[in-house]
Amino acid sequence: MGSVRETQLRWAILGFLLLQAASETPSQFSTEAMTLSSSTVADHLPSSPGPTWSQSQKHTSGLSADVPSSGRSSDSMSGDTSHNVTSTSPNMSFRTTADSTVPPSPTSETVLTVAAFGVISFIAILVVVVIVLVSVVSLRFKCRKNKESEDPQKPGSSGLSESGSTANGEKESITLISMKNINMNNSKGCPSAEKVL
């Protein structure tokens, strides 16, 4: 049982190293490198239940020929794994990591979604700009109307201020008169207060 796990671990390490080599130099990734590295692992493979060496070699050689050059989608790769149900888990993990390195091609649906989002955001920005411009223009007209309505009233407003000042003057004169009356009343009672004033 331990030898099966060791074999799986070796396959996982081999797959990881091959994946790194493929990502660093994809042009040098070929079937020769795959068969050379897999032949070194073949010496250590025990006779255990599962796929034979020829099946796994066929499986990996098909993988090395398809991954870097053909750019097939992940659906075609997963179709291969459904045919080979008895393949070992390191091969499966290598396939999933190889599939994750291939970027998905944009479909027309995603392109349309992005375009629709762009158009909607552009319209929203235009609406906000129009609202700001309308509010600025309306505030300017209101300010002009207020200035125009104040301009004819300026002589009248000075008249209002004069009438206000005369009203204030009347209040002061009333206050002075009442103070005189108080002083006169006090002076009648007290002759020295009259001399002070």
Swiss-Prot record:
- Classification via Pfam families: ECSCR
Q: Which organism is it from?
A: Bos taurus
**Similarity comment: family membership:** Belongs to the ECSCR family.
Q: Which GO terms describe its biological process?
A: angiogenesis; apoptotic process; cell differentiation; chemotaxis; negative regulation of angiogenesis; positive regulation of endothelial cell apoptotic process; positive regulation of proteasomal protein catabolic process
Please report the name of this protein according to its UniProt entry: Endothelial cell-specific chemotaxis regulator
Assigned GO CC terms: cytosol; plasma membrane
Ranges annotated as biased composition (Low complexity):
64-82
Which parts of the chain span the membrane according to its record?
A: 114-134
